UniProtKB/Swiss-Prot annotation:
This is Protein translocase subunit SecA. One of its GO terms (biological process) is protein transport by the Sec complex. May bind 1 zinc ion per subunit. ATP binds at residues 91, 109-113, 498. The keyword Cell membrane applies. Part of the Sec protein translocase complex. Interacts with the SecYEG preprotein conducting channel. Has a central role in coupling the hydrolysis of ATP to the transfer of proteins into and across the cell membrane, serving as an ATP-driven molecular motor driving the stepwise translocation of polypeptide chains across the membrane. Belongs to the SecA family. Its EC number is 7.4.2.8.
């Protein structure tokens, strides 16, 4: 309770501070009104001239804070002249909270788009770029189109970043002062920029300032969804089919247990026995059966926990994910870790090959890279603790311009779903007769279709908006506030379009919102309620629940069920009491708490990969920016040779195998016969290192002379290709480690610490592997001397060819996912023998 009290006290204080700023802005109103268009436009140039004199980011921020009241007044006046809209004081307050790097919580219909124009203009003056982030491309395009007139009038450029744009068009969009984009496209462009071969191919500038619309949807609801760029992995799909056939034979509570609350599934002893018999294995939990166990687990999850028309829909023979928070389908997105393939097997559609992750990032880590981050939404206060802890953004509830007139009825709870839906239909009929528009909110596609059937039987004309018919979304929402309209919508969250009341609807009580089930997130419920009573309009909302609703089943409806039985209440008699509302809210808080813990855990694990990603991307960028990477290459070669010497000549001198080292050095760095055993015998490590390095550097010089002025380009390409291939393999390895790490949570072992430690070891091994492979490629590649080598040739690896057969050449080096096994290394089969005496013979 202490945090909540502090939260609301803090909000009061913050609102007071914002009101002072709004008052200051209003003092410039008459002065701005008196300026000509040209004089008003010149204000932008004045600010920009001053900002160009300041290079330091913090000093620029201080200057922006200083000019804020006047600059906001400039935008207000320009908005009046260009758009015919004049921001209210509460919108100035919201805009100030956004500039401060916080979240402005503003109710539906309070004009968030206009509010954002002030901080967007102010921060765009620096020339560093401002990103306005929306949940879909339609909103990005519409907002950019509407607001570009204002920004262009003030001398600023506006770009829209869409998925369909070419590289050049994207670069132009990002070069603008203000760029509208979806969160997905920003994240993918960042990943793609860190996979380019030449710096000219990059499209983004350094991440400066982002304003996220529907910020809670993106930073909380989608926080755990990673953005993934993937390539095809060559894996058979037969295991998914076999696992699917097997789990269909299993019986609930006999062969496996399913926890409604956590959605966790576990095979029982009985189920394990069946699996061992079916797949003919002695011990299902043996390490060699990890892959089989994984397929059985995801097949179980697909069958039991993933529900058709709720978690996904089947469209044109494909599985399409349904966003649990918005009810929208997400074409192109796939469940990870083989779950998508398991669902494809379940639904008997074509199973697509698994993909291999080449680059990935979560929104949590992407948006934390901006210099300054802010947002706006209708509902975020309930998640302030998380937003503050993870993103360092406070949530300020901005007062409404006009008092809220909406009436929120208490929840009604019924014993069964049947009773609840009958009551909902009766309520719709009653209000529809009076001509009052009704919006019915459902949690799942299935429910919306069921209610639609009930209304059809009663002869009530209505529209359905769900994941299956999202094409008509704008049209349906536009008409939802008209007299007599009945609209059924799955999760109205993030729809981004206001429902405006038709003629004569105010007199009928405004829009009536009926929720048919509580969502596990209070924010989504609040967003549904918020569709009624916008901008001081009248409105009504009420939620109808049943003891069979998922939330009630998962969290303690037993007590209420017992109480209803004792009272002898039937299906048609609801309970309406504060106790019910408190119980529901308590259940929601528990779910939100569980989800927050899960997101926090995701972030803790993802932070391990984030630090590694930053190192790899920084290394890549350094290579891209340099014309000559020789110093980096030489450092890699030195490290590789040093490691090889220390590895082969450690411990008992009598055990030293000089022949093995000679073979290794010639295989990795030198031509055959370049090093003799006599040269290195009975010498210490430093002497051996110096001898080998002098020969290696001579070989390096030889390669340089062969390619002449193209050599530096050749080096860059080798480094980039090796880093990319090794990094891709490393992501895959880390993913497998993360999946399996929970199996170690026994005794005093902390899975996260284990993941951190092993992840670091794997990362170090990968870096060593990069050094070895870069050394081998650059020193051992055979170079075509016959013709001038073009930049594109080098890029494609065409500068490396086989020789004419006069010179004996070892096999071309390949980038492997594991380092080569030295002849004196322990054999990986676990026999304890050296590799040369075991599987390395012959």
């Amino acid at each position: 309770m202490g945090f909540i009290k502090k939260m609301f006290d803090g909000n009061k204080k913050e609102v007071k501070s914002l009101r002072k700023v709004a008052d200051q802005v209003q003092t410039f109103e008459e002065e701005m009104k008196s300026l000509s268009d040209e004089a008003l436009q010149n204000k932008t140039k004045e600010y920009q001239v001053e900002l160009q004199k300041i290079e330091d980011y913090k000093q620029q921020e201080a200057y922006l804070n200083k000019i804020l009241p006047e600059a906001y007044a400039v935008v207000r006046e320009a908005s009046r002249r260009v758009l015919g809209m004049f921001p209210f004081p509460v919108q100035i307050m919201g805009g100030t909270a956004i500039h401060r790097g916080d979240i402005a919580e503003m109710r539906t219909g309070e004009g968030k788009t206009l509010t954002a124009t002030m901080p967007v203009y102010l921060n765009a003056l620096t020339g560093r770029g401002v990103h306005v982030v929306t949940v879909n491309e339609y909103l990005a395009s519409v907002q950019a189109e509407e607001m570009s007139h204002l920004y262009n009038f003030l001398g600023l450029t506006v770009g829209v970043n869409l998925n369909s744009l070419t590289t050049e068009e994207k670069r132009a969009a990002y070069a603008c002062d203000i760029t509208y984009s979806t969160n997905n496209e920003l994240g993918f462009d960042y990943l793609r920029d860190n996979m380019v071969t030449y710096k000219e191919e990059r499209v983004m500038r350094p991440l400066n300032f982002a304003i996220i619309d529907e910020v809670d949807s993106i930073l909380i609801d989608e926080a755990r969804t990673p953005l993934i760029i993937s390539g095809q992995a060559e894996k058979s799909t037969s295991m998914y089919i076999q696992a699917n056939v097997f789990v269909k034979m299993l019986k609930d509570d006999i062969d496996y247990t399913y926890d409604e609350k956590t959605k966790g599934i576990q095979l029982t002893e009985n189920g394990i026995d069946k699996a061992e018999r079916m797949f003919k294995v002695d011990n299902l939990y043996d390490v060699k059966n990890v892959n089989l166990m994984h397929h059985i687990n995801i097949a179980l999850k697909a069958q039991r926990a993933m529900l058709k028309d709720i978690d996904y829909v089947v469209e044109d023979g494909e599985i399409v994910i349904v966003d649990q928070f918005t009810g929208r389908t997400m074409p192109g997105r796939r469940f990870s870790e083989g779950l998508h393939q398991a669902i494809e097997a379940k639904e008997a559609v074509e199973i697509q090959n698994e993909s291999k992750t080449m680059a990935s990032i979560t929104f949590q880590n992407f948006f934390r890279m901006y210099n300054k981050l802010s947002g706006m939404t209708g509902t975020a206060k309930t998640e302030e603790e998380e937003l503050l802890n993870i993103y360092n953004m406070a949530v300020t509830q901005i007062p409404t311009n006009k008092p809220v007139q909406r009436i929120d009825g208490a929840d009604l709870i019924y014993a069964s779903e049947k009773g609840k839906f009958h009551a909902v239909v009766d309520e719709v009929i009653r209000r529809h007769k009076e001509g009052q528009p009704v919006l019915l909110g459902t949690v799942a596609v299935e429910t919306s279709e069921y209610i639609s059937e009930l209304l059809k039987k009663k002869g009530i004309r209505h529209n359905v908006l769900n994941a299956k018919n999202h094409e008509r979304e704008a049209e349906i929402v536009q008409n939802a506030g008209q007299k007599g309209a009945v609209t059924i919508a799955t999760n109205m969250a993030g729809r981004g379009t206001d429902i405006k009341l038709g003629e004569g609807v105010k007199e009928l009580g405004g829009l009536a919102v009926i929720g048919t089930e509580r969502h596990e997130s209070r924010r989504i419920d609040d967003q549904l309620r918020g569709r009624a009573g916008r901008q001081g309009d009248p409105g009504y909302s009420r939620f109808y629940l049943s003891l069979q609703d998922e939330l009630m089943v998962r969290f303690g409806s037993d007590r209420m069920s017992t109480m209803m039985t004792k009272l002898g209440m039937n299906d048609d008699q609801p309970i309406e009491s504060k106790m019910v509302s408190r119980a529901v809210e308590s259940a929601q808080k528990r779910v939100e708490g569980n989800n927050y813990d899960s997101r926090k855990r995701t972030l803790e694990y993802d932070d391990v990969l984030r630090k590694q990603r930053e190192i790899i991307y920084a290394e890549r960028n350094e290579i891209l920016e340099k014309d000559d990477c020789s110093d980096q290459v030489k450092a890699m070669i030195e490290q590789s040779v040093r490691r090889a010497v220390d590895y082969h000549f450690t411990g008992d001198e009598n055990e030293y195998d000089y022949e093995a080292f000679k073979n290794y050095a010639e295989d990795m760095y030198l031509t055959e016969g370049a090093l003799s055993v006599d040269e290195i015998s009975r010498r210490d490590n430093e002497e051996i290192y110096d001898i080998v390095m002098s020969k290696v550097m001579a070989q390096y010089q030889h390669q340089k002379e062969e390619l002449q002025e193209q050599f530096h380009e050749f080096e860059r390409m080798i480094m980039l290709r090796t880093i990319d291939m090794k990094w891709t393999d490393h992501i895959d390895t880390m993913d497998q480690l993360r999946t399996g790490i929970h199996l170690r949570s026994y005794g005093q072992i902390n899975p996260l610490r284990e993941y951190q430690n092993e992840g670091l070891t794997l990362f170090d091994t990968m870096l060593e592997s990069i050094e070895d492979d870069v050394s081998k490629y650059i020193l051992k590649s055979i170079i075509d001397r016959g013709e001038q080598v073009e930049r594109e040739q080098v890029g494609k690896g065409e500068a490396m060819v086989a020789n004419d057969g006069k010179e004996k050449v070892k096999q071309q080096p390949k980038v492997k996912s594991e380092p080569d096994i030295g002849r004196n290394e322990p054999c990986p089969c676990g026999s304890g023998k050296k590799y040369k005496n075991c599987h390395g013979r012959g």
